[in-house]
Amino acid sequence: MNSSPDPLAALTATDPTIADLIRAEERRQSEKIRLIPSENYVSKAVLEATGTVLTNKYSEGYPNRRYYEGQQFIDQIETIAIERAKQLFGVDHANVQPYSGSPANLAIYLALLSPGDTVMGMALPMGGHLTHGWPVSATGIWFRSVQYGVRRDTGRIDFDEVREVARRERPKVIFAGGTAIPRIIDFAAFAEIAREVNAVLVADIAHISGLVAGGVHPSPVGHADIISTTTHKTLRGPRGAMLMSTEQYAKALDKAVFPGLQGGPHNHTTAAIAVALLEAMQPEFRDYARNIVANAAVLAEELLARGFDLVSGGTDNHLILVDLTSKGVAGKPVARALDRAGIELNYNTVPFDPRKPFDPSGIRLGTPAVTSRGMGPAEMRQIAAWIDEVTTAVAKGDEEALAAVEQRVAGEVRELTKNFPTPGLDR
């Protein structure tokens, strides 16, 4: 019998409604197969660091340059996080204060640009990110944005277009990276183009930072002037972000983060980032990164064998983008049916998608979270089979038959997940 104290005992006594909802979310994360590629599980150590008294302390400024007293221990924690980031990624400078990925990217704009300046990024429907200048984002409203995409024949970044647009539009900043890129990003090719047009190259590695740290994706260091990343995806840290750069941009970035955009940093998050970075420096993390990529390759291979159309024909990293057009269904109904069946992924636009963003042609899935639970090739093949079953049932349009498939698969998923510990949650 587990005699460990209930970690939510105080919360249950104060606010049982919230405590019950947290427990329900814990069960959901344990019982489902989580394939959203931007999600993961943090370790118990990271969870513990996040929920500490560090949240009580205001710390405007930077280590040894604060506006409030009582920073003796906060300064040490933030300095440790900075030094670990510099060591892990091999960079000159790191800022660990950005609240999340979008504020981190906005700090880059504030540091380098004036309103109306031209920026260039991957078009959102092609796999880019809102903050790379997409029109509905502040970055596309306050700045002049131009986009590049992928080749229609290969689904890979069209470097001829990147070069052509860069030469024609002369952007001051070029973003390399995105949210739905299943292939290796050629940072050297981006750097060559950026140098030609005298642009600052920003590598947004939010999705792949853990793969870079684990040595299974080429690093942008030495190619990019600035590197932006979240800490909560493949890096397995808390919800936060980091900006890394050469010394040339260090002061401008620090000033843009504080006082430009933010006040006091979230010290509890900074501590958890430090813990996650230490975990990422261990040999086991390199094994984890390799297993993410290996699992994605098996999952992609099995989906291809079952007749699914994968954007770019496969994957080199953690992410798979599936165009369901050939299956006769759209992404949203398949994603929702799979969720009811215990498999969580997201509907997503695919390159050159004729459908609307809220009802797109594709689904996006990845392997970071299932790999964190210790799943391997056999489980990837089973997951592909379940995805195929549910997709086929959706395509047939028989709601009663679909409900039966969903119910059966959900039960099978629950049985499978019992065999794999849930990081941070199993007590």
Swiss-Prot record:
<dbReference type="Pfam" id="PF00464">
    <property type="entry name" value="SHMT"/>
</dbReference>
<keyword id="KW-0663">Pyridoxal phosphate</keyword>
<keyword id="KW-0963">Cytoplasm</keyword>
<keyword id="KW-0554">One-carbon metabolism</keyword>
<keyword id="KW-0808">Transferase</keyword>
<dbReference type="GO" id="GO:0019264">
    <property type="term" value="P:glycine biosynthetic process from serine"/>
</dbReference>
<comment type="pathway">
    <text>Amino-acid biosynthesis; glycine biosynthesis; glycine from L-serine: step 1/1.</text>
</comment>
<dbReference type="InterPro" id="IPR049943">
    <property type="entry name" value="Ser_HO-MeTrfase-like"/>
</dbReference>
<dbReference type="GO" id="GO:0004372">
    <property type="term" value="F:glycine hydroxymethyltransferase activity"/>
</dbReference>
<feature type="site" description="Plays an important role in substrate specificity">
    <location>
        <position position="232"/>
    </location>
</feature>
<dbReference type="GO" id="GO:0035999">
    <property type="term" value="P:tetrahydrofolate interconversion"/>
</dbReference>
<comment type="pathway">
    <text>One-carbon metabolism; tetrahydrofolate interconversion.</text>
</comment>
<keyword id="KW-0028">Amino-acid biosynthesis</keyword>
<dbReference type="GO" id="GO:0030170">
    <property type="term" value="F:pyridoxal phosphate binding"/>
</dbReference>
<protein>
    <recommendedName>
        <fullName>Serine hydroxymethyltransferase</fullName>
        <ecNumber>2.1.2.1</ecNumber>
    </recommendedName>
</protein>
<comment type="subunit">
    <text>Homodimer.</text>
</comment>
<comment type="similarity">
    <text>Belongs to the SHMT family.</text>
</comment>
<dbReference type="InterPro" id="IPR001085">
    <property type="entry name" value="Ser_HO-MeTrfase"/>
</dbReference>
<dbReference type="InterPro" id="IPR015421">
    <property type="entry name" value="PyrdxlP-dep_Trfase_major"/>
</dbReference>
<dbReference type="InterPro" id="IPR015422">
    <property type="entry name" value="PyrdxlP-dep_Trfase_small"/>
</dbReference>
<dbReference type="InterPro" id="IPR019798">
    <property type="entry name" value="Ser_HO-MeTrfase_PLP_BS"/>
</dbReference>
<feature type="binding site">
    <location>
        <begin position="128"/>
        <end position="130"/>
    </location>
    <ligand>
        <name>(6S)-5,6,7,8-tetrahydrofolate</name>
    </ligand>
</feature>
<dbReference type="GO" id="GO:0005829">
    <property type="term" value="C:cytosol"/>
</dbReference>
<comment type="function">
    <text>Catalyzes the reversible interconversion of serine and glycine with tetrahydrofolate (THF) serving as the one-carbon carrier. This reaction serves as the major source of one-carbon groups required for the biosynthesis of purines, thymidylate, methionine, and other important biomolecules. Also exhibits THF-independent aldolase activity toward beta-hydroxyamino acids, producing glycine and aldehydes, via a retro-aldol mechanism.</text>
</comment>
<feature type="modified residue" description="N6-(pyridoxal phosphate)lysine">
    <location>
        <position position="233"/>
    </location>
</feature>
<dbReference type="InterPro" id="IPR039429">
    <property type="entry name" value="SHMT-like_dom"/>
</dbReference>
<dbReference type="InterPro" id="IPR015424">
    <property type="entry name" value="PyrdxlP-dep_Trfase"/>
</dbReference>
<feature type="binding site">
    <location>
        <position position="124"/>
    </location>
    <ligand>
        <name>(6S)-5,6,7,8-tetrahydrofolate</name>
    </ligand>
</feature>
